Amino acid sequence: MAGGAMKRYAIVIEEAGANLAAYVPDLPGCVATGESADEVERLIREAIELHLEGLVEDGLPIPEPSSRVEYIEVNAET
């Protein structure tokens, strides 16, 4: 995808035992795990690039990023 149009995909990073896991809501099946935030972010970036390259090789469309990330504040007192 070098030289192609840049797209900005939302990622979700969750704790997974002793590691972190990341996935891309707009790219089902595109996941990565790592031992640190830096590692999992690097690995999910690589996974996204490989996923998109595979779609292009298979003649499939590249999904447009459509997921939004918002945080909602709630009263958590019990």
Describe every region a protein language model picked out.
Residues A18-L55:
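Amphipathic, hydrophobic secondary-structure cores in small proteins
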Residues M1-A10, R42-T78:
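Short, charged, surface-exposed hinge/linker loops at domain edges
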Residues A10-V12, A21:
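Beta-strand secondary-structure signal
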Residues E14-A16:
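Short beta-strand micro-motifs enriched in acidic
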